[in-house]
Amino acid sequence: LALNSSIDYTRIGADDANSLSGPRYWRNLRFTNNIFEISSKFELILFQISDLGGTGRYRTNMDVFAHAGISFFYHNPKGSKNGYSWVNLRPLKTEGFSYKSIAFATPIGGGINITYNRYTRFGLVLNYRQTFTDYLDDISTVFADPNNLSTEAAELSNQYIGPEESSVNFMPGEKRGNSKNKDVFFTLSLTYSKYFMGRNPRYRTYRYGRNSY
């Protein structure tokens, strides 16, 4: 069992124009969000091969692991009317009230690490984050009354492009998002590590009855 702490940058985004759902396509909203995250995770090795390839030289090792932990992050969703000019959404209060730019998440996932020649490591890591905010995309509850918003906020909050007979579903008080479920996001990362300690004999380890160093 090991403890791993990291600082990560992730950029997420979506566009209703790419949706196959009619109502969501008509909603016509889009966002992008830069997320800066600090996390600590416990890692548990599930499976280990100490001599990958069976060469007998013990130069390449492989670890399969799972992890879980907690993180906090700063995020800043931006919206656009044309997909080119982006505006910070949080200060605009597009649903009529504010939310925090700092939030927490529980990262859960796993991956594979391959260590070559004891000091160089490559990894592939899948990370699922269940957050405690519903505003990564600035969309959570219902459409606000445009009379209670600034002109810019009203324009970005409701960009309906559907048929006229369905416009009633996008009026103030109607569903804009789903506040019952908090936001989640996934990342798939390639990692590289270089060890600068461990050349001292005191760090030697033994596998399969022989000294691997």
Where are the regions a protein language model picked out?
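Amphipathic alpha-helical recognition patches that constitute DNA-binding helices
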Residues: 37, 63
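Membrane-embedded beta-strands of outer-membrane beta-barrel proteins
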Residues: 40, 66, 108-110, 126, ...
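Transmembrane beta-barrel domains of outer membrane proteins
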Residues: 43-45, 111-113, 193
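Short helix/loop segment immediately N-terminal to the Walker
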Residues: 50-60
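Hydrophobic alpha-helical segments of small multi-pass membrane proteins
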Residues: 64-71
